[in-house]
Design a protein with these regions (language model features):
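Active-site-proximal loop/short-helix segments
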Residues: 17-18, 63-94, 257
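Short, solvent-exposed loop/turn and secondary-structure capping segments
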Residues: 6, 12-17, 75-80, 85, ...
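Active-site-adjacent "subsite" loops/lids of carbohydrate-active enzymes
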Residues: 8-51
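Carbohydrate-binding surfaces of carbohydrate-active enzymes
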Residues: 25, 36-48, 58-63, 71-73, ...
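Outer-envelope exported proteins of Gram-negative bacteria
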Residues: 2-4, 62-64, 137-139
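Short, hinge-like loop/turn segments at secondary-structure boundaries
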Residues: 18-23, 152-157, 253-254
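Active-site-proximal helices and loops of the catalytic beta/alpha 8
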Residues: 86-169
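Glycoside hydrolase catalytic-domain groove-lining segments
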Residues: 146-209, 223, 264-266, 271
């Protein structure tokens, strides 16, 4: 288990997890403001008490902790605001201009990057002071979000049907070396120094009042084949199991300004909010078996892309999309033929010739294969 301890956690929860009673207080949230840190300390103490005995050091299942979420990248709208005033966001004043709504590319320079990194470091120190000691600490890696250099693993994301962005074909079905250049770059770290670890792979998506995309099962399978072939060495979903938004004394804790349902957080996930499985559950399970059985071989392998792979566009329906993970004289070939918001076609008479260190391998050994559409 890897636990996201916040304080800001988003998840389409009211204020992204920040309580109403911090709205309008005379200090900056999500910063090292002393008054804010008093509440962080109180929160972390409560979380630590609830997790006591479940940490890996105690023989439990918790092997990792994510600190904060999308710090200096994204925020949630405050559910309360003064009449006739624009929406306020759960973010420090100096980060307002940099704040995105949802996972996306950050085009602007961060105004106070060191303040963000230092706040992340402080959060880790507070967590440790309450005994939340784990082998792995992670932080949002995409969109130039704040991290703790050399102390956390910056995790990655990919959403192919985002309801917060313009409708269009996603680049996340094109093979790239995401270990060197992570998705949603620029980022605040050098990719080659860290493992490429997926945390929010959008194999589903939450419907909103204004956007209600239906995601086919093939979308999740294609996304994960592409991500592993592009260098990912970990699998993490958002969401893998849907849920139900909890209810408080005055209503449900849903992110109402964002137009999400009050109760359902099904997310079209592989396992739905009531425990039912979708077709995506079964297709992804094959990938999970592959990683479980061959992950120790895959992890140290680098990415080899075909010549001119960087010229393939999402709308290109006739060029084979593939990549190789390779080390010395062994490797794995990853092929996909899916693209969101686009009709694909079968690719016939396909064969690959792989030049290894000491031999040349043809796939298939004889003849050709057909890569069916949406595979």
């Amino acid at each position: 288990t890897l636990v996201r301890i916040g304080p800001f956690c988003h998840g389409e929860i009211r204020n992204g997890g920040i309580p109403d009673w911090l709205y309008g207080r005379p200090f900056l949230i999500r910063t090292n403001d002393r008054e804010y840190l008093k509440y962080v300390d109180r929160l972390y103490a409560e979380i630590a008490s609830q997790l006591e005995g479940f940490f890996h050091k105690d023989g439990g299942c918790i092997i990792g902790i994510q600190l904060e979420n999308e710090l200096q990248h994204s925020a949630a709208p405050w559910a309360i605001r003064y009449p006739d005033q624009p929406i306020d966001y759960t973010v420090a004043d100096y980060d307002v201009q940099n704040t995105k709504f949802g996972v996306s590319v950050q085009e602007q320079d961060i105004q106070s990057p060191e303040a963000g990194n230092q706040h992340m470091k402080t959060l880790k120190e507070i967590a440790l002071s309450h005994g939340m000691e784990v082998p792995l600490y992670t932080a949002t890696g995409w969109g130039n979000a704040a991290i703790i250099p050399q102390e956390v693993i910056p995790v990655t994301a990919a959403y192919t049907y985002p309801t917060w962005a313009d409708i269009g074909m996603s680049p996340f079905y094109l093979f790239r070396d995401i270990h060197t250049t992570p998705d949603y770059s620029p980022v605040r770290y050098e990719g080659y120094r860290y493992p490429s670890f997926c945390a929010e792979m959008g194999v589903g998506i939450q419907m909103t009042y204004g956007r209600r995309p239906r995601i086919p099962a093939e979308a999740g399978e294609g996304l994960m084949v592409r991500s592993l072939g592009s260098g990912a060495n970990g699998i993490g979903y958002y969401m893998y199991h849907g849920g139900i938004t909890p209810q408080g004394k005055r209503g449900f804790f849903s992110d109402e300004p964002s137009g999400v349902p009050k109760m359902s957080y099904d997310f079209q996930a592989p396992i739905g909010e009531f425990g039912h499985t979708r077709a995506s559950y079964h297709s992804l399970r094959i990938i999970h078996h592959f990683v479980n059985d061959f992950g120790h071989l895959l992890a140290p392998m680098g990415v080899v892309l075909p010549e001119h792979s960087d010229t393939i566009t999402p709308s290109n329906t006739h060029t084979l999309r593939y990549a190789v993970r390779k080390k010395e004289n062994a490797g794995f070939v990853f092929i996909t033929n899916f693209q969101d918001h686009c009709k694909r076609e079968d690719l016939r008479d396909v064969s690959l010739t792989l030049k290894l260190a000491s031999e040349t391998v043809r796939f298939p050994q004889d003849g050709t294969v057909t890569v069916v559409k949406n595979a």
